[in-house]
């Protein structure tokens, strides 16, 4: 994957995986099941509106939830890809590994749906107070 957000990098494409990039999914639901919330925490620096919509649509396709009830958080890592499918050259300086970007983002709907379903299936009762 091209390191699109790492200005001091001496290379454009990763030679291997030092630390994997994750998306952690958390599912919260009220006792009545009326209120639902999904929190997704991505190892990305930024996210385009197209990818944001793709992620929310994939969650809404498997869960009765509004897009406003899906919170997307980003770790702000600079070791990741460009921010979207429309920025394949990283603002002009990426010349290697461009062919890896779209397949990476195209894998999001299935992977995110699987992560959310795993979170839903592993939900346990708890009390939240403050």
What are these regions (language model features)?
Residues 1-73, 77-130:
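Conserved beta-alpha junction segments in alpha/beta enzyme cores
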């Amino acid at each position: 994957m091209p390191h699109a957000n790492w200005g001091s990098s001496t290379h454009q494409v990763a030679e291997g995986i030092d630390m994997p990039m994750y998306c952690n999914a958390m599912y919260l639901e009220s006792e009545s099941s009326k209120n639902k919330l999904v929190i997704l925490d991505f190892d990305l620096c930024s996210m385009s509106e197209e990818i944001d919509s793709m992620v929310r649509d994939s969650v809404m396709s498997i869960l009765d939830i509004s897009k406003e009830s899906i919170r997307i958080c980003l770790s702000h890592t600079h070791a990741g890809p460009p921010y979207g499918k429309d920025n394949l050259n990283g603002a002009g300086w990426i010349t290697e590994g461009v062919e890896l970007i779209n397949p990476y983002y195209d894998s999001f709907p299935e992977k995110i749906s699987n992560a959310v379903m795993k979170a839903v299936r592993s939900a346990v009762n708890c009390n939240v107070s403050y």
